[in-house]
Curated annotation (Swiss-Prot):
InterPro entries: COX5C
Any single Gene Ontology cellular-component annotation: mitochondrial inner membrane
Protein name: Cytochrome c oxidase subunit 5C
Native source species: Hordeum vulgare
Localization terms from the record: Mitochondrion inner membrane
Lineage, highest ranks first: Eukaryota, Viridiplantae, Streptophyta, Embryophyta, Tracheophyta
Source organism, top-level taxon: Eukaryota
Transmembrane segments: 16-34
Length: 63
């Protein structure tokens, strides 16, 4: 039984440019999501203080 040669995929080392691109993309996506989260929190805080200033809400418990 003569064994034939099977073509296997040769493993290459990591591509530096590809790794930089993937890292940059993931960093920008994560940074954008973090920034959007903080904008949302800032909007909620500003809305709370605006309502407090207008007298629509109060932080004092009514008895």
């Amino acid at each position: 039984m003569a064994g034939g040669r099977v073509a296997h995929a040769t493993l290459k080392g990591p591509s530096v440019v590809k790794e930089i691109f993937i890292g940059l993309t993931l960093g920008l996506v994560a940074g954008g999501m973090w920034k959007m989260h903080h904008w949302n929190e800032q909007r909620k805080t500003r809305s709370f203080y605006d309502m407090l200033e207008k007298g629509q809400i109060s932080v004092v418990v009514e008895e």
